[in-house]
Amino acid sequence: MAQSETVELILDAAEQLFAEKGFAETSLRLITSKAGVNLAAVNYHFGSKKALIQAMFSRFLGPFCISLERELDRRMAKPEVKPSLEELLAVLVEQALAVKPRSGNDLSIFMRLLGLAFSQSQGHLRKYLEEVYGKVFRRYMLLLNEVAPRLPPLEIFWRVHFMLGAAAFSM
């Protein structure tokens, strides 16, 4: 079996099991058993359970952030035409839905995992997400703040989180 195939099998199994059982309740042994690979394969390819979790999130967030940043660049290329609040909110949803799925329920599983990341104690993951993907989200939030100056930034922040949470829990 090719290394890349092993990595994909592990990530697929991890996504499914973490979404079903949560992070703490899912062991590496359970993941490798479901993936049909040797237990040592996780340490070889990822180094740790934390790194596996981060790699799992990168599968969706990497392409999503690239497409979100591209779309923001495209819309901001014409500074004389500012997008509306509704357009910016639509951009976020459109880019999330535009990530090419590997299977039919990828987005649903990812949203469930994202909800778990914030409801279970996954401090390492929150820190990782901020370090790796925070730049594009900060840019997005600044644009929202510009087009909705009457709303306090903290309120916009929580409204966007509520919107994403509603999307996550409805899938």
Outline where the language-model segments fall.
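N-terminal intrinsically disordered/low-complexity leader segments
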Residues: 1-5, 75
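Helix-turn-helix
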Residues: 9, 17-59
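Hydrophobic alpha-helical connector segments
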Residues: 70-108, 160
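Amphipathic alpha-helical packing segments from all-alpha helical-bundle domains
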Residues: 87, 105-109, 122-148
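All-alpha amphipathic helical-bundle segments outside canonical DNA-binding/catalytic cores
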Residues: 148-164
